[in-house]
From Swiss-Prot:
Biased amino acid composition, Polar residues: 1-15, 123-134
TM regions (residue ranges): none
Protein name per its UniProtKB record: Zinc finger protein AZF1
Subcellular location: Nucleus
Function as written in the Swiss-Prot or TrEMBL entry: Transcriptional repressor involved in the inhibition of plant growth under abiotic stress conditions. Can repress the expression of various genes, including osmotic stress and abscisic acid-repressive genes and auxin-inducible genes, by binding to their promoter regions in a DNA sequence-specific manner.
Statement: the UniProt record of this protein carries the keyword Zinc-finger: yes
GO molecular function (one): DNA-binding transcription factor activity
Length: 245
């Protein structure tokens, strides 16, 4: 197809004027290019530029002088102070438990309870007559009276002791054995107001009563029965002559 178009008469007629135009224009272009002058391009010399810039830079002395002038003219700009941070109270400083007596505050209820114990007054600091409790626990058949005495001392220690008192002569002994040995003196003599071999008497002491009142009652009973005995067991017995008929 391409060969046919080239060989056809229409294609040859259109291609001839184009070729002629090109042939006519080529010598003109060549002449114009020949008449023109070449333009010179600017060449940059980096070394020369560096020298010029170095000349423009100030020396060290000038630079220091400029710095001093700038510092003298300028004003110091102070940044505003930062607001203080809110102080956070530590758990140990947070004290809600307060003593009602001295006003001290504590961080825990346990610490407050331990502190309150120091305000408590010790009990039983003095001996009073009302603190002495006398109780009659037991009465022996031989007529002895056993009394338990509890005394509250200042140290809070109760001292309990037993008083063994003879029901006939009202002598007191530290032990029941000593009282029993003493009672034999009364029994061997046979001077018993009741006529029996033994007497059973009991004395009740109430707290707050006086022992002298009980003694007076006992002596009044003895005088009503047969009067006071005319001998003392602590003295040797008198020699008695016995006549037999």
């Amino acid at each position: 197809m391409a060969l046919e178009t080239l060989n056809s008469p229409t294609a040859t007629t259109t291609a001839r004027p184009l070729l002629r135009y090109r042939e006519e224009m080529e010598p003109e272009n060549l002449e114009q290019w020949a008449k023109r002058k070449r333009t010179k391009r600017q060449r940059f010399d980096h070394g020369h530029q560096n020298q010029e810039t170095n000349k423009n830079l100030p020396s060290e002395e000038e630079y220091l002088a400029l710095c001093l002038l700038m510092l003298a003219r300028g004003s110091a700009v102070q940044s505003p102070p930062l607001p203080p941070l809110p102080s956070r109270a530590s758990p140990s400083d947070h004290r809600d438990y307060k003593c009602t007596v001295c006003g001290k505050s504590f961080s825990s209820y346990q610490a407050l309870g331990g502190h309150k114990t120091s305000h408590r007054k010790p009990t039983n600091t003095s001996i009073t007559s009302g603190n002495q409790e006398l109780s009659n626990n037991s009465h022996s058949n031989s007529g002895s009276v056993v009394i338990n005495v509890t005394v509250n001392t200042g140290n809070g220690v109760s001292q309990s002791g037993k008083i063994h008192t003879c029901s006939i002569c009202f002598k007191s002994f530290a032990s029941g054995q000593a009282l029993g040995g003493h009672k034999r003196c009364h029994y061997d003599g046979g001077n018993n107001g009741n006529g029996n071999g033994s007497s059973s008497n009991s004395v009740e002491l109430v707290a707050g009563s006086d022992v002298s009142d009980v003694d007076n009652e006992r002596w009044s009973e003895e005088s009503a029965i047969g009067g006071h005995r005319g001998f003392d067991l602590n003295l040797p017995a008198d020699q008695v002559s016995v006549t037999t008929s």
